[in-house]
């Protein structure tokens, strides 16, 4: 049986975290990028992590952050996986004694083709839409057909996903994991419980 894994990113409150977990999210993303409207600090992250039931993965998202600051956060917040969304290379990403996911901003098929070679130590790759000045959370999607024949390293689909289009996205790409942020929000940084539930329910229906 194939299960479509779901990650709800940009969690900012324990309430949103708990709702997403109870709705069936496999992972929750905490954004440690000050420029993001979904950014949180260590104290908020600790409260969110403490509210979660067992077996829900906590993912820390960093964008071009210093190694020193990443280590400080990892020492104080129970993080299971790191997601790097900036210009980091494999040598930087692998130094923190945590599994890591590397976001790839997709413009062409070669971005997808070359990703596994560029990041051989990544647990998985996350394919997101390219934006010239932003590193994610834009609500934009890329050409999903570019992934239809991809069979390399485990990967996650992101970029412009919503409860309404996640089914189509999975059917086109064959994704086994999906990541959403803005597509399930009432406003930036505040999740909409109904959208979260609908997104996860749709992903679960596609599992087989």
Curated annotation (Swiss-Prot):
Keywords: Amino-acid biosynthesis, Aromatic amino acid biosynthesis, Isomerase, Tryptophan biosynthesis. GO terms for biological process: L-tryptophan biosynthetic process. Disulfide bonds: none annotated. Signal peptide: none annotated. SUPFAM superfamilies: Ribulose-phoshate binding barrel. It catalyses: N-(5-phospho-beta-D-ribosyl)anthranilate = 1-(2-carboxyphenylamino)-1-deoxy-D-ribulose 5-phosphate. One of its GO terms (molecular function) is phosphoribosylanthranilate isomerase activity. The keyword Metal-binding does not apply. Its EC number is 5.3.1.24. InterPro entries: Aldolase_TIM (IPR013785), PRAI_dom (IPR001240), RibuloseP-bd_barrel (IPR011060), TrpF_fam (IPR044643). NCBIfam families: PRK01222.1-4. Belongs to the TrpF family. This is N-(5'-phosphoribosyl)anthranilate isomerase. The gene is trpF.
